[in-house]
């Protein structure tokens, strides 16, 4: 569905994305995560055809990113998605359906079907009078008005209450089950972990980890073991229930604690395994210095990279209040 090769984007000499390569399969939810300035937004906007890459290729199906025909098969939901607030939800979605030349009868059917699935009430209320959660549902509905094959969602549940957040995540899973391909980015890694089939972690413009969440945790995370002894052992801390806790990093150390406890006349009452979360791995990776670059072109500092990731150079925008959206 998506093939990205050697993607590089620079702003004023500063690299926002450095030589990214990845593929996204049809019907997959593909996560793109990283700290501020990592290159996530630049990557998503390049996929959406809003930014021209400095180098590299981005192919989406049979099209290059940015091709007019490709846009007819794409739905893009940016993190900030201003709406035409004097319109109602119905009139707003029909307006965008007209932009895609969707026949009026089909546009009405799609509008009502999507609003039904999103459980959006008050469809004839002004958008400016709606809550943030309702507005986000309308923005999601807009991304679907042309029945796209590919959806690019940047922070789809940002700032929403827990109930609406869970609904948006469930709806995203439903889209993939219906055969849609979704590229999904969020700072809340629980959202990513709960919906994404595969993930790439970016740091300072580079992809530094990739795979399924279990694969990333296994390759980059560290499993720890909490050993509860019945007697004090070296490095242990007393617990409220009268046991002594020692946290170690491998089974050899677990066995060493057992031997020490038994030698002291006690034993091990319990062993608990703590698997790393995606957030644990992310925090570890985001704190590492970037790998040495082979091309010798240098590295922007983190502040410059952050500015670049939200940069303006080469960005295509629509007119009106829906800048950068379709």
Please give the residue ranges for each predicted region.
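Conserved catalytic motifs of ABC-family nucleotide-binding domains
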Residues: 147
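Conserved ABC ATPase "signature" region
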Residues: 94, 98, 105-122
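Catalytic Walker B motif of ABC-type/P-loop ATPase nucleotide-binding domains
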Residues: 151-155
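Short, charged/small-residue-rich alpha-helical element at the C-terminal edge
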Residues: 215, 221-289
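Conserved ABC transporter NBD signature motif
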Residues: 56-66, 70
């Amino acid at each position: 569905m998506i093939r990205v090769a050697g993607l590089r984007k620079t702003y004023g000499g500063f690299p926002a994305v450095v030589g990214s390569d990845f593929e996204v399969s049809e019907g997959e939810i593909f996560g793109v995560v990283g700290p501020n300035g990592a290159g996530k937004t630049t990557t998503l906007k390049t996929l959406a055809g809003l930014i021209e890459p400095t180098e590299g290729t981005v192919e989406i199906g049979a099209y290059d990113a940015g091709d007019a025909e490709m846009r007819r098969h794409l739905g893009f939901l940016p993190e900030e998605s201003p709406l035409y607030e004097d319109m109602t939800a119905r009139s707003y979605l029909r307006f965008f359906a007209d932009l895609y030349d969707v026949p009026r009868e089909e546009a009405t059917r799609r509008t009502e079907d999507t609003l039904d699935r999103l459980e959006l009430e008050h469809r004839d209320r002004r958008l400016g009078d709606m809550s943030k959660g309702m507005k986000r549902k309308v923005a999601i509905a807009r991304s679907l008005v042309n029945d796209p094959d590919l959806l690019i969602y940047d922070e789809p549940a940002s700032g929403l209450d827990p109930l609406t957040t869970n609904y948006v995540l469930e709806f995203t899973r439903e889209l993939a089950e219906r055969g849609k391909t979704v590229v999904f980015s969020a700072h809340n890694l629980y959202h990513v972990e709960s919906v994404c089939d595969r993930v790439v972690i970016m740091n300072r413009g580079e992809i530094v980890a990739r795979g399924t969440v279990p694969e990333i945790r296994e390759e980059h995370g560290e499993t720890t073991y909490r050993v509860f002894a019945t007697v004090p052992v070296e490095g242990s801390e007393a617990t409220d229930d009268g046991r002594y806790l020692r946290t170690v990093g491998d089974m050899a150390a677990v066995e060493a604690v057992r031997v020490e406890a038994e030698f002291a006349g006690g034993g091990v009452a319990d062993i608990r395994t703590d698997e790393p979360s995606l957030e644990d791995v992310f925090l570890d990776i985001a704190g590492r210095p970037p790998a040495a670059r082979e091309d010798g072109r240098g590295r922007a500092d983190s502040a410059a990279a952050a500015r670049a990731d939200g940069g303006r150079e080469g960005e295509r925008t629509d007119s009106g209040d829906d800048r950068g959206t379709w």
